[in-house]
Amino acid sequence: MGHPIKTLLGVALPGMVLLVGAVACGTREPAAAPVVAAPITHPDLSGFWNLDMSVARDDDLMKQVAPNTAFIDDTGPKELPAGDFGGLQLKPAALEAARKWDPYTQLTPENACKAPSIVYAMQGPFPIEIFQSDKLIVIKLEYYDMVRILFLDGRQPESDYPASKVGFSSAHWDGATLVVETTHLEPATITNNGLDHTADVRVIERFKLSPDGKKLLATQEFADPAILENHGVRFIAWRKEAGQHVFPYECDPGFAGNYTKPTAKKPK
């Protein structure tokens, strides 16, 4: 019977015999197992969230607000009266337009169901529902059936991306905080009393969970240099409620007929 090395290779040199023998005897060091990084996990914001006006402002979120920013305290059903813009410093043309505001123009069949932009809608007294994945987050508002898509993959809007009331939102995680930047918004109200933002408004939102995960906390900061000398910010909080979903808004423009502008009485 021939040598097994010769039988396998045909010809075996002495060095080759030693090498193969070493392999056969198992003296080679085993390869190190590859190091697998732990998957990055982020807070789960998904679920049904109802507005909660009892939550105090979050100090960590408020510290990230830019200087020269007015805090607008109108979250929920609260409305600022005419002429009160929550500390926002209006430029002359914007102030003049706001002074001409007539609330009854909103209470017409053609305007009664006109949706605001997210600048005003996010703080409204209606719940939201969040669906979350690694690529995007969807926020469904009950208010005016608005749906927001927050892209997490780094994409940017095309040059001809259309403006809308929800705009284009790109998002990223900063630790446990979701940071969202929104542009491409159609002009719409800021304070529902005559002050409208332009199509160039830029909105920065930060979302985080409370330590117990039962509250969703957010700031909404916006800048619109065409009409404002400073920035504005709102603080908004929601509480999580299991087994709930947002309802259709179903705005009926007919309700505008319940509101008519008072007419001056003719002198007798």
Tell me the role of every PLM-derived stretch.
Residues 25-268:
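PEST-like low-complexity, intrinsically disordered acidic/proline/serine-rich tracts
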Residues 10-22:
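Bacterial N-terminal signal peptides
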